[in-house]
UniProtKB/Swiss-Prot annotation:
It comes from Neisseria meningitidis serogroup A / serotype 4A (strain DSM 15465 / Z2491). GO terms for cellular component: membrane. SUPFAM superfamilies: UDP-Glycosyltransferase/glycogen phosphorylase. Pathway: Bacterial outer membrane biogenesis; LPS lipid A biosynthesis. It holds the Pfam family LpxB. HAMAP family: LpxB. PANTHER family: LIPID-A-DISACCHARIDE SYNTHASE (PTHR30372), LIPID-A-DISACCHARIDE SYNTHASE, MITOCHONDRIAL-RELATED (PTHR30372:SF4). The lineage of its organism: Bacteria, Pseudomonadati, Pseudomonadota, Betaproteobacteria, Neisseriales. GO terms for biological process: lipid A biosynthetic process. InterPro entries: Glyco_trans_19 (IPR003835). This is Lipid-A-disaccharide synthase.
């Protein structure tokens, strides 16, 4: 273990959303403990904060049951290596951010060796596989929850958990500012603008981007002046998007791919087509109407459909307790249906205004000083 004035904090993330949380956490910890050091698995944003990544985070960014099975030997090899490295380094605390199937296994092994463990972002145990709660309580010392309905599940099982709010709700302004967003991106104020968010992982891009681009072509026929914006989450996804856009069917599509800037892109848009996941919450906090879509391998879909315990898959719909925005999944994730649903938002501003009121209420519910609350909990577990 390190000197408590300069604790060694191990962190592991599996995808772009976890990288963002990790970067904010590092910053907040450094405000309280400037000499803290960070090591583990992280992405580009965490590295920019001085994080030492022992393995390539992109290698863990895999979705779906079938896709995970294909990459399982490599993922297990990375996990074994990370456990071995951290047992040698003896960090003061281990923080697994999201990616529960990977990080909870690491946490369990480290906890058995006396290293305090924290899991930041509860798995969706309220949606499916609720039986995991008891196991998670044994794997980690503490769970930091982003949604208010989560802590009680762990407390009822004898664990320690707390609601720290959602970092996006803290960081993003309550008020809308479409004009500034469009100026920033060089987009005309008077034209139809649609944002496309096909996912943060290369595997998601492979499934969703072609469908989203075909949807954009249909919208372009309906609105010839339309522009399309797509924020690339990582360099790897940007490269894959460029490869897909080289197909002849997408020639001439008025699409701008940005380096990240997802919030600015969403604020500039009239409506957003988004892959199910954390990005749906970001769109809601931007107060933008959206259509949620997702498409995975048939085997993965059949497995998930049997296990899911909630009527919706999109976070805004789950948190609001109703289908506030359309969800077009799997067989319904076709360009014709997606384009029609986006056009419905664009052509009905009264519906958009009502939705924005719902999203404002949701924003206020989730708004806390998340990074600082998480930093305080992590340092407490580290004995600082």
């Amino acid at each position: 273990m390190a000197d408590k004035k300069s604790p060694l904090i191990a962190v592991s993330v599996g995808e772009a959303s976890g990288d963002l949380l990790g970067a904010h956490l590092i910053r907040a910890i450094r405000k309280r403990c400037p000499q803290a050091r960070f090591v583990g698995i992280g992405g580009e944003l965490m590295k920019a904060e001085g994080f030492e990544s022992l393995y390539d985070q992109e290698r863990l960014a895999v979705r779906g049951f079938v896709e995970v099975v294909r990459r399982l030997p490599e993922i297990l090899r990375i996990r074994r290596g990370l456990v071995r490295d951290l047992l040698s380094l003896k960090p003061d605390v281990f923080v697994g951010i999201d990616a529960p199937d990977f990080n909870l296994g690491v946490a369990e092994r480290l906890k058995r060796s006396g290293i305090p463990t924290v899991h930041y972002v509860s798995p969706s145990v309220w949606a499916w596989r609720r039986e995991r709660v008891g196991k998670i309580v044994h794997q980690v010392n503490r769970v930091l929850c982003l949604f208010p309905m989560e802590p009680q599940l762990y407390l009822d099982a004898g664990g320690r958990a707390e609601f720290v709010g959602h970092p996006m709700a803290q960081l993003m302004p309550l008020e809308d500012d479409r004009e500034t967003a469009r100026k920033t991106l060089g987009v005309d104020a008077g034209i139809p603008v649609f944002a496309l968010l096909p996912g943060s992982r290369v595997s998601e891009i492979d499934y969703m981007a072609p469908v989203f681009f075909q949807t954009a072509l249909l919208l372009l026929k309906r609105y010839p002046a339309a522009r399309f914006l797509l924020p690339a989450a990582t360099e790897a996804t940007k490269r894959r998007l460029a490869e897909i856009l080289q197909r002849s069917e997408f020639a001439g599509l008025p699409l701008t791919v940005t380096d990240r800037q997802s919030e600015t892109v969403c604020r500039a848009a009239d409506a957003v087509l988004v892959t199910s996941g954390t990005a749906t919450l970001e769109v809601a906090l931007c107060k933008r109407p959206m259509v949620i879509s997702y498409k995975i391998s048939p085997l993965t879909y059949a497995y998930v459909k049997r296990k899911i315990k909630v009527p919706h898959v999109g976070l805004p719909n789950i948190l609001l307790g109703k289908e506030a925005v359309p969800e077009l999944l799997q067989h319904d994730a076709v360009p014709e249906k997606l384009a029609a649903a986006l056009a419905d938002w664009y052509e009905h501003p009264d519906k958009v205004a009502a939705l924005q009121q719902d999203f404002r209420v949701l924003h206020l519910l989730l708004k806390k000083d998340t990074a600082d609350l998480a930093a305080r909990a992590v340092l407490e577990e580290a004995g600082c």
